[in-house]
């Protein structure tokens, strides 16, 4: 994540907002500050692995990433290990599954957990054959309790069973229920359990790192990705949604961003300050598009954001276009005044944001994104821009 680029954008916005009337300044900053914190306070998720030592976690995380990943097998010490993909973000892992197989000790694990609070536990099992998870559940319970006592936080636990694609759906469901029964059988694990998910992680990567589509047998990986991202604290969600390609979570975060910026633009657009607001609208819309790009997993670049505006048929002064559209409406419908200006600013801003979500997150073509923009309609249930 390019924090400096994001910080520079928000500093520019804050400088422009400082020129607004006092009451409006406060209202705008109240809406923007939570969004600013989501992006500027982002950090890597901290995930603790529990469960079956024989489960292939490299295959599981490779399936989540869509990229071949060889995870470090802890042999001597329990340490947090950071994994990153260039331009995509990263995550941190503490593999606590091998207490009975390696020289890992409780004191070493305790040190790692005391040092940094886990965000999420993944209890992983794998293979077509049934296995005894009694010891894994006992060890997992102790680690979960240790983290809860040290950090006074109840962290979620997701059960994951990785099975061959050749298994029937009924067999898969039976194995998932078996894992869930093991987890519910432990009071401590049961109290933290979010859900159990059955997946198939098998996918072949070519020598160049690309996916062999004819050998892509992944199942339910998208469900697991979104479950992981949603259970993380807010400050770790964007990075996780990016790197694990959790589309539903990406859309939810982006929608929150678009609605907040639209609300602010509606408030700014309604002010009787001729053309003084257009740099603020422009900066807000530009920040919104770069934010959607960031959420989607694209490498953040101001040039790419400007090119997106251009592809929609807008120049960087898009805010001015929306405001001028409002002025034209005022001439035709006397008496409505500035409320139309705010509504048009809101509709235009929402159209830009919705188009950016469709293009960067949903993967539609630029032609389709342009059609969405040209509709310039707010959601029916929305009161955005009604001030």
Annotate each predicted stretch with a short phrase.
Residues 1-97, 290, 299, 354, ...:
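Conserved G1/Walker A P-loop phosphate-binding module
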Residues 18-38, 46-49, 204-267:
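C-terminal-of-GTPase-core extension/linker across diverse P-loop GTPases
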Residues 85-88, 107-194:
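Conserved C-terminal guanine-recognition region of P-loop GTPase G domains, centered on the G4
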Residues 257-295, 299-350:
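Membrane-inserting effector segments that mediate pore formation, membrane fusion
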């Amino acid at each position: 994540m390019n924090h400096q680029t994001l910080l520079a954008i928000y500093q520019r916005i804050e400088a422009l907002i400082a020129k607004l009337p006092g009451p409006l300044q406060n209202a705008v900053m109240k809406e923007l500050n939570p969004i600013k914190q989501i992006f500027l306070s982002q950090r890597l998720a901290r995930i603790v692995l529990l469960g079956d030592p024989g489960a292939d976690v490299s295959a599981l995380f490779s399936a989540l990433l869509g990229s071949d990943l060889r995870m470090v097998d802890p042999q001597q010490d329990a340490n947090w290990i950071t994994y990153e993909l260039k331009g995509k973000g990263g995550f941190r892992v503490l593999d606590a599954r091998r207490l009975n197989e390696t020289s890992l000790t409780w004191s070493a694990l305790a040190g790692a957990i005391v040092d940094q609070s886990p965000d999420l536990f993944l209890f992983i099992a794998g293979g077509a054959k049934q296995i005894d998870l009694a010891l894994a559940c006992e060890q997992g319970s102790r680690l979960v309790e240790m983290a809860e006592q040290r950090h006074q936080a109840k962290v979620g636990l997701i059960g994951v069973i990785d099975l061959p694609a050749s298994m029937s759906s009924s067999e898969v469901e039976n194995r998932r229920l078996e894992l869930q029964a093991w987890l519910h059988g432990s009071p401590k694990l049961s109290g933290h359990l979010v859900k159990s998910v059955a997946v198939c992680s098998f996918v072949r990567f070519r020598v160049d790192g690309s996916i062999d589509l004819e050998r892509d047998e992944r199942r339910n990986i998208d469900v697991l990705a979104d479950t992981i991202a949603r259970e993380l604290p807010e400050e770790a969600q964007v990075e996780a949604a990016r790197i694990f390609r959790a589309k539903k979570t990406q859309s939810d975060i982006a929608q929150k961003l678009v609605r907040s910026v639209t609300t602010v633009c509606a408030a700014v657009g309604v002010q009787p300050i001729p053309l003084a607001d257009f740099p603020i609208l422009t900066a807000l819309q530009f920040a919104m598009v770069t934010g959607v790009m960031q959420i989607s997993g694209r490498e953040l670049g101001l040039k790419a954001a400007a090119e997106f505006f251009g592809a929609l048929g807008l120049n960087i002064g898009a805010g001015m276009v929306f405001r001028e559209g409002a002025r034209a409406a005022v001439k035709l419908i006397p008496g409505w005044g500035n409320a139309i200006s705010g509504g048009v600013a809101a509709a235009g801003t929402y159209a830009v944001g919705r188009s950016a979500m469709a293009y960067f997150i949903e993967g539609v073509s630029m032609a389709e994104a342009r059609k969405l923009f040209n509709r310039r309609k707010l959601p029916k249930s929305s009161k955005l821009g009604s001030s």
